[in-house]
Amino acid sequence: GMGGFGKTTLLKQVNNNFCHQQHNFDVVIWAAVSTLQDDIGKRIGFSEDRNWKEKSLQDKAVDIASILSGKKFVLLLDDIWEPIDLTQLGVPLQNLNDGSKIVLTTRSAGVCDQMDAEKVEVSSLAHDEAWKLFQEMIERSTLDSHTSIPGLAETLARECGGLPLALKV
């Protein structure tokens, strides 16, 4: 979905839940697209290996695949703008049959299609939900400071079109 719907916020909450709760995955990896292979390498133990940092992309992919092939993992990818060949980076897609998961956020349905990903659409909030979120973002004393403010605030919340990011900013 378009920007401001809360895709990144949702993915961060998923990541935080994995960090603070018991789960049945061997490793949870949050990776930025720009440094995807290095981020994966860090999470599986290659961060201190100076030799690994100097390896080619293909050699890193072999190393990543050798570690992840024996693990049940969750790979969280935020803000994907174009399709990524994860196998080329060393991500063993056959593990998805054994319960590993890859979750990505994107603004492009086409990226989901090209990566054969199941789509979960996020949409704007209904007015009641948007108004509730807006009220949580401002002090109650501000709303109560003048009789015209609640009406103006509700109009402003409506103008945000139910986009969580717009309501928070």
Residue ranges, per PLM feature:
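Conserved catalytic network of the ASCE P-loop NTPase/AAA+ motor domain
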Residues: 22-23, 66-70, 93-98, 113-114
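Central P-loop NTPase core of STAND/AAA+ ATPases
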Residues: 31-94, 143-148
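Non-catalytic, charged helical/coil tracts that couple and regulate nucleotide-powered enzyme cores
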Residues: 40-55, 98-100, 108-169
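Walker A/P-loop nucleotide-binding motif
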Residues: 1-11
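Conserved catalytic segments around the Walker B and adjacent sensor/switch elements
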Residues: 20-35
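A conserved segment at the C-terminal end of the G1
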Residues: 12-19
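Structural recognition of the conserved hydrophobic beta-strand(s) that form the central parallel beta-sheet
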Residues: 76-79, 99-107
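Short, conserved phosphate/pyrophosphate- and ester-handling motifs at nucleotide-, phospho-/glycolipid
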Residues: 7-8, 78, 163
